[in-house]
């Protein structure tokens, strides 16, 4: 068994002395609290005074430690957990903190106190702490490079154009792929007015979503330009439109429907007012060639001009002819 060194023996003796003194002090404090006779002794009064001072100090520290940690300078009186040194004369303390909350009334009071101290200092010394700002104009170099002048003029013109141009109003643009939300007062009569829409493509009528009041607005279209004379039916190709037709529009075909195809009556979903076009989804051929609507679902009531019988109301049909279905029902 190894012998203990003198240092280790000294450490053990110090720990034993401290623990014995601590236990004796604790026993004495407990005896002062429990015994009324011992509480009259002066040493018990000293113990009570020390305990009250410790409780008050811990309460003050709890009020000052409010939801953040600070390292650096701050106004005194704020609630924080501080790691640093205090300057007793100045109302500043070590700050450098991560803060999660602050008592606003305390901060206002400290700011008022600081201002009052500055004003009292000015009145006592009759001096002003503020300095006058120099009004001397900065020297200008008349021999400026002409290229720099042109660059500055271009930059100024670009900022002015961005502010005054109504076409670049309230939008985000990324080349030709952009989103714009605004109105252009100069192009009110133009059908291709870029008003409140998102466009993805080169052609004004190609691959975009527009929301407006005119006939070609308030729809999402994915197709070709309808202005091409060669393809007349491309206007109704693969788009979804929600709007109203003009006064000269005899049919309600362009009203509140989603269509996917070249034939106006082929492969679409329509919701309108007329008897034939009211509240149904149709996937079939042109009704001009065959009166029986093929492969569709309809939910609604027929009008006065509706040639479809009442049996065709509110049904789902997947067949070739309505006569065959009637024969099946009669049989």
From Swiss-Prot:
Compositionally biased region (Basic and acidic residues): 146-158, 279-296
Domain of life: Eukaryota
Phenylalanine amide: modified positions: 71, 83, 100, 174, 181, 200, 211, 222, 242, 260, 271, 283, 299, 318
Localization: Secreted
UniProt entry keywords in alphabetical sequence: Amidation, Cleavage on pair of basic residues, Neuropeptide, Repeat, Secreted, Signal
Location of the region described as Disordered in the Swiss-Prot/TrEMBL record: 122-158, 279-310
Function: Excitatory neurotransmitters that directly modulate chromatophore function by activating chromatophore expansion at the chromatophore neuromuscular junction.
Protein name: FMRFamide-related neuropeptides
Species assigned in the record: Doryteuthis opalescens (California market squid)
